[in-house]
Amino acid sequence: MNRNDRLIYFAIFIVVLAQLVICNYLFLGPLATLTLLPVAVLFIPLKHKSAAAMLLAFLMGLLVDWLSDGVLGLNAAALVPVAFARDFLIRLFVGEDTVVRMDPVTVNKPGWFRMIAMISVAILLFLLVYVPLDSAGERSLGFNAARIGISYAVSLLAGIALSAGVTDIVTYCI
């Protein structure tokens, strides 16, 4: 494992800890769910293929569910589709050459517009699974749609800040 991968794993560990703090101590109301985990899944090193990335995402989600006051398996179930789509999203928004060379996913190569688009799709995919599973048929479609929209906006802002931080770690600590 090279130094670059260790830095990325450390950043993912910090994101999981931050998500635990958010889940346990920061309540934004019934309409907002702040999640950082889809962005962490995008930063899993590309040497891990889809199956390994899905397993890592599942374990991250299960750890957050287990150590927070959430439903066990909820984050895990919502993160697995994000990990499944990770390679496709990186190929689509960052480029095939990044996947072939197994470079770290940072803002430096694709630019902010493509990075925000990739993070946006990952967060939306996560929320489209998470919110219906969390409501379990108890909430109306309108409430769930509002929750997805508000959670998307909040999580996207946090995800952009997080990707800037990971880019700084990878770029300046090497």
Question: What function would you assign to each model-found segment?
Answer:
Residues 1-174:
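Terminal, non-globular segments
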